Design a protein with these regions (language model features):
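C-terminal substrate-recognition "lid" of short-chain dehydrogenase/reductases
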Residues: 89, 166, 249-277, 282
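Canonical Rossmann dinucleotide-binding motif of NAD(H)/NADP(H)-dependent dehydrogenases/reductases
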Residues: 10-42
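Residue(s) in the substrate-gating loop at a strand-loop-helix junction
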Residues: 174
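Alpha-helical segment proximal to the catalytic Tyr-Lys
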Residues: 159, 204-205
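Short, small/polar-rich loop/turn modules that mediate ligand/substrate recognition or access, typified
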Residues: 207, 212, 270-272
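A glycine/serine/threonine-rich, flexible loop-to-helix segment
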Residues: 8, 108-115, 208, 220-245
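Active-site helix of classical SDR
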Residues: 154, 191, 199
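Catalytic Tyr-X3-Lys loop
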Residues: 101, 111-152, 166, 170, ...
Length: 283
């Protein structure tokens, strides 16, 4: 049986999924997993070159794909993207809010190292100086993509889903939004906590229209940026990180993608839930 035949019989056959932040990494893995289950895809990313890799992978599955460059922090750009998706496919059945800014700058790496040392090395208890050192720009930059982008895309999707009384929205959150697992980046943690709260309030709002909204609070994901960090980290830094995860390893994008497919399907009764695959880092 061909790949296209398998997709035609998949759990998401005939549906249209829109995945943001769909370049290589978690978003691309989610898009590919949904295509393999039969969904047609609208994929977007702010990086056109990164998006082209996902577009090629999706083409090999035999499903239809619309790839669009979009800055999700721009509400007008988001509305235009959904208009193009609707014009092409006539609906959007599934939304995956994956696009996010992650802490990767040199200053953020320094904060990360201080945080890991605090957790794993005996030292005098003192302030890490992280929050007090943040500039207005350091703080505000997180909200445009991680919070506003999720809201803009959710609003646009609901304008399509509510009249049809059907839809699935999956928000990609983080264990950083559940506790202090990203203490080195207060802005990231705060926005991911905001995504969790928005998930619950939106779920309550639209459940009566048969629209199910849930979140995945990811633990560490072995994406290209995370792999790059591991390659530059010292052995001691890597060991300290792995000691924080009971399974002793980082989660693969495909492991998270399979959960997203499940939440996009009709195989569950979940509404407003936050599911956290994290290797036991948070229990």
């Amino acid at each position: 049986m061909s790949k296209s035949s398998n997709a035609a019989q998949g759990r998401l056959a005939g549906r249209v999924a829109l995945v943001t932040g769909a370049g290589p990494g978690l978003g691309g893995a989610i898009a590919l997993a949904m295509a393999q289950e039969g969904a047609n895809l609208v994929v977007c990313d702010i990086n056109s070159e990164a998006l082209s890799h996902t577009e090629k992978a999706l083409a090999a599955t035999g499903v239809e794909c619309l790839a669009l460059r979009c800055d999700v922090s721009d509400s007008a750009a988001v509305d235009a993207m959904f208009s193009q998706a609707f014009e092409r496919f006539g609906t959007v059945d599934i939304l995956v809010n994956n696009a996010a800014r992650v802490p990767t700058s040199p200053a953020e790496e320094s904060r990360r190292n201080r945080h890991y040392a605090y957790l794993t090395t005996p030292m005098e208890r003192q302030s890490l100086g992280i929050v007090a050192s943040l500039s207005d720009e350091d703080w505000l930059k997180w909200w445009d993509v991680n919070m506003h982008g999720v809201f803009f895309c959710t609003r646009a999707a609901l304008r399509i889903m509510e009249p049809r009384r059907s839809g699935k929205i999956i928000n990609i959150a983080s264990i950083a939004g559940l506790g202090t697992q990203s203490m080195h980046s207060p802005g990231y943690s705060a926005t991911k906590a905001g995504v969790i709260s928005l998930t619950k309030t939106t779920a309550l709002d639209v459940a009566g229209a048969n629209i199910h909204v849930n979140a995945i609070a990811c633990g560490a994901v072995l994406t290209p940026p995370f792999q790059a960090y591991l390659e530059t980290a010292t052995a001691a830094q890597r060991n300290s990180l792995f000691q924080l995860i009971p399974t002793g390893r980082i989660g693969q994008p495909a492991e998270y993608a399979s959960l997203a497919v499940y939440l996009a399907s009709d195989d569950h009764y979940l509404v407003g839930q936050v599911i956290s695959p994290n290797g036991g880092a948070v229990i």
